[in-house]
Amino acid sequence: MNNVIKISEHFWIFEEDGVRSFLFEGDERAMLIDTGFGTLQIREMVAGLTDLPVFLVNTHTDKDHTGCNKDFKPVYMHPAEMEHYQNSLPEGCCMEDVCPLWEGDVIDLGHWKFEVILTPGHTPGSIMLLEREKRMLISGDTIQNGDIFMFGAGRNMQAFQNSLKKMIAMADAFDSIWPSHGSYPLTADIIPGILKGAQDMEAGKLLGQEPPWPMPCKKYVCDVVAFLY
């Protein structure tokens, strides 16, 4: 399976056209984080890696993270994300399958324990998942070195900057960052650069370029990341 990368025992990544999903196998159940665009047969790929029951957590619900949501139940997300999800509900999905995850909740898989951290801005209910013992952070789209989409419904640049400040304050809790886009793993050193880029963009210090595809935005490039805004 060329799209599957085994990172360590009980931890795999699925790569799909610039976006990735994560699978963590626990003692009695497994957790899938996001489901990509839907071009991969993620359900079959997961079944080939674990015999355990699988539940799904969405870091957020942009369409490149929910393409195979219909194949998994239940689907967990922060309640602040549910309206965003409902407004573009993927085919075959229904809100009855959605369960809430709140900030501070701990997803206990046995040898994996992930704490939910609310980091709005990219979307209203974007979350990260922190494994404190293994010192790793699943960051969704908020911390990455690719293109961060900050135009359109649900985006909030001030909330985004506040979320970055929150993660800077928590940086002593993790060593590796596993984003949905760009390269991996990253370290916490990148977060101040993302924040500075966002601040410089708002201050008019970055030159807006034409986006890579026809979109109602400009592309702003800083040292560590680019914003589509």
Protein language model regions, located:
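Short, solvent-exposed loop/turn segments at secondary-structure boundaries
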Residues: F37, L89, F149-G154, D189-I190
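Accessory terminal helices/loops
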Residues: K165-Y229
